[in-house]
From Swiss-Prot:
Name of the encoding gene: lprP
Recorded family membership: To M.tuberculosis LprP.
Signal sequence extent: 1-21
Source species of the chain: Mycobacterium bovis (strain ATCC BAA-935 / AF2122/97)
Protein name (database record): Uncharacterized lipoprotein LprP
Superkingdom of the source species: Bacteria
InterPro entries the UniProt entry points to: LppA/LppB/LprP
Compartment annotation: Cell membrane
Keywords per UniProt: Cell membrane, Lipoprotein, Membrane, Palmitate, Signal
């Protein structure tokens, strides 16, 4: 009996040790700090993206094009601001909440009355090559499924650097909805000098580019 008990205890300890090696810091709490190695991986992703100012200019140009196409094919549609969003001055959305970077979102715009299905098809047909040239792909289906056909109400877009454009047509009961988001990027100045003091982690005021825990460094304190 004692031998069986010892064998069971040893087996349980073995399983516990195996699990300990596999469990990540945020396995049970998705909001927990995932560890320095994972944070460095995420920071390197952001460091490799275009500067925030570059993305802002690209989105400003695309915004003008989107509005021009809607005005061309659906002149009855008028835009208004429906929802004012809070603009992040520092920090990014999940999974980059502990990453050094900035993320900005537009207001949520509504177009009334919405383009007709025929007008909408003309609009997205002209926008398709524009989005493709800017590096976007459709973001209107669940992962693993093909994009919805051209002319479907949802013509939202996403790019590999995290930039998103939400563009969804309405109908005779609801307006067109439109907004965009830069995703997490570094301002150009943060590559040559630290962020302003009030935008640095409170417990790590001496951060500097490339903002890594590992070599070549830039962070020394665990992120909250």
């Amino acid at each position: 009996m004692k031998r069986t008990s010892r064998s069971l205890t040893a087996a349980l300890l073995g399983i516990a040790a195996l699990l300990a090696g596999c469990i990540k810091p945020n396995t049970f709490d998705p909001y927990a700090n995932p560890g320095r190695g994972e944070l460095d991986r995420r920071q390197k992703i952001v460091n490799g993206r275009p500067d925030l100012e570059t993305v802002q200019q690209q989105l400003a140009n695309l915004d003008a094009t989107i509005r021009a196409m809607i005005a061309k094919y659906s002149p009855q549609t008028r835009f208004s601001t429906g929802v004012t969003v809070s603009h992040l001055t520092n920090g990014c959305n999940d999974p980059f909440t502990r990453t050094i970077g900035r993320q900005e979102a537009s207001e949520l715009f509504f177009g009334r009355p919405a383009p007709t299905p025929q007008q909408w098809l003309q609009i997205v047909t002209e926008l398709a090559p524009v989005f493709k040239a800017a590096g976007f792909r459709p973001n209107n289906s669940v992962p693993g499924d093909p994009p919805q056909p051209l002319g479907a109400p949802n013509y939202s877009q996403i790019r590999d650097d995290g930039v998103t454009i939400n563009l969804v047509n309405g109908d005779n009961r609801g307006p067109l909805g439109y907004s965009y988001n830069t995703g997490c990027h570094l301002p150009a100045a943060w590559r040559t000098a630290p962020p302003p003091l009030n935008m640095r982690p409170a417990n790590d005021p001496d951060v500097h580019y490339p903002y890594l825990y590992g070599s070549p460094g830039g962070r020394t304190r665990d992120a909250y």
